[in-house]
């Protein structure tokens, strides 16, 4: 019965997202909340300038409302769901402020790095202090085994790293039409299956609400995108997926299921280190998806390829997390 409820959860979130988007996009246009495009980015992206951004509000509302209602309906509104809603709200708010500054102040960089980091730290610390001992414990498990390592207060550092790093990694992936929407749906779908296997149905409900919300948004975000999610959506999704991995005790498995996000982040780190130490760039441009664009791949080809890689990694993650 609950498995059917999970499908209903995804369906409801999808319908809300699809229904809200056509109403919200003209509203964003009226407010002139259009995305500005970096001059140093691929030239093909200049035509996207002015496309409405902050569409992540649609994802945010769809998944928050649906997960809350369905968790209450199935009596699974526990500490886990509450923590997930807290992280999603907190990181979504940071993203909203970042987007607002970009579109209103016409500053493409939005919040300063320091301002963003402070906000992310506050949310991560609150997550740890509220959840420790109640929703999760301070050990990590080796995926596919019963081996666990108690980290004690070192786990606090891991939580901060995962939430801040996860939100920024997902944010880096949001550079092509539909890229993040598709990869996020795949990753959250994988974690929902693992959550069901662990009988953590509240977490599963939340994950399926995200799947439905981002797939509904993808209808309008696929190439050519009518709207971008902005940091409002990407930071919220990044913080949420890291929190899900922590609550399921699949911290290490996040590296596999979120492999696309990891590759995007590593490409930026490698690029920066290489340029600062040798004066040469490893990639034509980072994050990685832009490298393939400049290699002559069409935007759609890059997106579908990354979706495919994300799907294969998700299947591997499910196999390790459920059947090994």
From Swiss-Prot:
The chain crosses the membrane at residues 5-25, 52-72, 77-97, 122-142, 149-169, 176-196, 201-221, 227-247, 253-273, 302-322. Pathway: Cell wall biogenesis; peptidoglycan biosynthesis. InterPro entries: Glycosyl_transferase_4, PNAcMuramoyl-5peptid_Trfase, PNAcMuramoyl-5peptid_Trfase_CS. GO terms for molecular function: metal ion binding; phospho-N-acetylmuramoyl-pentapeptide-transferase activity; UDP-N-acetylmuramoyl-L-alanyl-D-glutamyl-meso-2,6-diaminopimelyl-D-alanyl-D-alanine:undecaprenyl-phosphate transferase activity. Its cofactor is Mg(2+). NCBIfam families: mraY. This is Phospho-N-acetylmuramoyl-pentapeptide-transferase.
């Amino acid at each position: 019965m609950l498995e059917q409820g999970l499908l209903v959860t995804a369906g409801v979130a999808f319908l809300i997202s699809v229904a809200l988007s056509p109403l919200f996009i003209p509203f964003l246009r009226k407010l002139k909340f259009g995305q500005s495009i970096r001059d140093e980015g691929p030239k093909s992206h200049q035509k996207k300038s002015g496309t409405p951004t902050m569409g992540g509000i649609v994802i945010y509302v769809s998944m928050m409302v649906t997960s809350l209602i369905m968790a209450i309906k199935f009596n699974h509104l526990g500490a886990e769901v509450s923590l997930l809603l807290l992280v999603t709200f907190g990181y979504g708010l940071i993203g909203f402020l970042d987007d607002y500054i970009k579109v209103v102040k016409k500053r493409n960089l939005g919040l300063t790095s320091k301002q963003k980091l402070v906000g992310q730290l506050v949310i991560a610390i609150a997550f740890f202090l509220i959840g420790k001992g109640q929703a999760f414990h301070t050990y990590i498990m080796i995926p596919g085994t019963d081996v666990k390592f108690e980290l004690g207060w070192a786990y606090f550092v891991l939580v901060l790293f995962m939430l801040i790093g996860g939100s920024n990694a997902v944010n880096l992936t949001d550079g092509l039409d539909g890229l993040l929407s598709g990869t996020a749906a795949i990753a959250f779908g994988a974690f929902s299956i693992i959550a069901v296997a662990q009988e953590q149905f509240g977490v599963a409900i939340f994950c399926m609400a995200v799947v439905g919300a981002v797939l509904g948004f993808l209808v309008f975000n696929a190439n050519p995108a009518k709207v971008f999610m902005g940091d409002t959506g990407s930071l919220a999704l990044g913080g949420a997926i890291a929190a899900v991995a922590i609550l399921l005790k699949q911290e290490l498995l996040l590296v596999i299921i979120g492999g696309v996000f990891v590759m995007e982040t590593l490409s930026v780190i490698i690029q920066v280190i290489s340029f600062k130490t040798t004066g040469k760039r490893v990639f034509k441009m980072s994050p990685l998806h832009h490298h393939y664009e400049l290699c002559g791949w069409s935007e759609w080809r890059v997106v579908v390829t990354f979706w495919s890689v994300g799907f294969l990694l998700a299947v591997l993650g499910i196999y390790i997390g459920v059947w090994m």
